[in-house]
Amino acid sequence: MAFNVITFLQFSVFVVILFNINLHSASAGSKGSSASQSSDNSVVAKFCDTNCTINEGGKWTECKGGCFCVHVGNETVGRCMKLDGDYDYPSPKPEE
């Protein structure tokens, strides 16, 4: 009787391990994404016509027309960039 219980428990553990491996391989091989990524709701980054520079006070010059300054590392010249698209970042101000 004791032999049958041990065999049953070993078989149960073996089935559980196979089940977990099967679940992992099915989810790891799936090609579908969890969120839709259509081009209708994507964000497009565009460079503006102006550059931005750092002044003697250590402050970057402002970009015009809804653009913001992008610079790399310790460079003193950057490019103005604008984001267009369907994005909804929360405002720090409370809604009225």
UniProtKB/Swiss-Prot annotation:
Main location (coarse class): secreted
Disulphide linkage map: C48-C67, C52-C69, C63-C80
GO cellular component, one term: extracellular region
GO terms, molecular function: C-X-C chemokine binding
Highest taxon listed in the record's lineage: Eukaryota
Keywords per UniProt: Disulfide bond, Glycoprotein, Secreted, Signal
Glycosylation sites: N51, N74
Record's signal peptide: 1-28
Location of the protein in the cell: Secreted
Function: Salivary chemokine-binding protein which binds to host chemokines CXCL1, CXCL2, CXCL3, CXCL5, CXCL6, CXCL10, CXCL11 and CXCL13.
Protein name, UniProt field: Evasin P1100
Organism, as annotated: Ixodes ricinus (Common tick)
